[in-house]
């Protein structure tokens, strides 16, 4: 029995939604499962990169497939004359993946023995000078695209250098839609001033990251990262370095470590429920 390609199902439904709701304001969230592994591009896109070496070959093919489906959503907006006054956001949740998995038990359902290496579930990404990847708090793992299309208000090709977070989009969209924000405390800020002007600055005095026991806090160009391995380790980096996050300043800047650790402790006490 052949399965059905999930991106095709999702975009077909998105196209239908746009058609059905084209005559009044709408919010559409299209949560693509691509280019997340398993990397399964459309055959016609895989053929475009036959002369390229792996893992770049497979990743390039898959990115082209992603681009194709994003293009279909955009084409549907254009078809019904909605492009000019529709805000389109393209976001990602983490950097490129270099994960691989090994079977850790006997009698695995796949039939393969314990210790069998499935191989890489990704690869091929490139983050330039920013080292790191998915699963790390290095910039290569958390600095992700934020692409906005809004022809009626934002000119093509403009860029912004201010730091923003995915947390900022809810208050931003609430402001644009004239909707009252939730009564609950929000960590995000409206970035409408940044959208409108390249001179606007970020309202974030610090950014916080946490995954299980790992955490990081960033203030301006300083970033403190805690890894629980080997009894716990702190590393301090300056994002303004020529080679960011390569040099560790922990021993050189103890006062910065103390200040950033204090910021994290205050944030964690506010966010996390007390442990029993």
Predicted segments with their positions:
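Loop/turn elements at helix/coil->beta-strand transitions in domains of secreted/extracellular proteins
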Residues: 22-28, 82-88, 144, 202-204, ...
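Beta-strand elements within well-structured catalytic alpha/beta cores of enzymes
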Residues: 26-31, 63, 70, 77, ...
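Short, solvent-exposed turn/loop segments enriched in Gly/Ser/Thr/Pro and often Arg
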Residues: 29-40, 90-98, 187-188, 209-212, ...
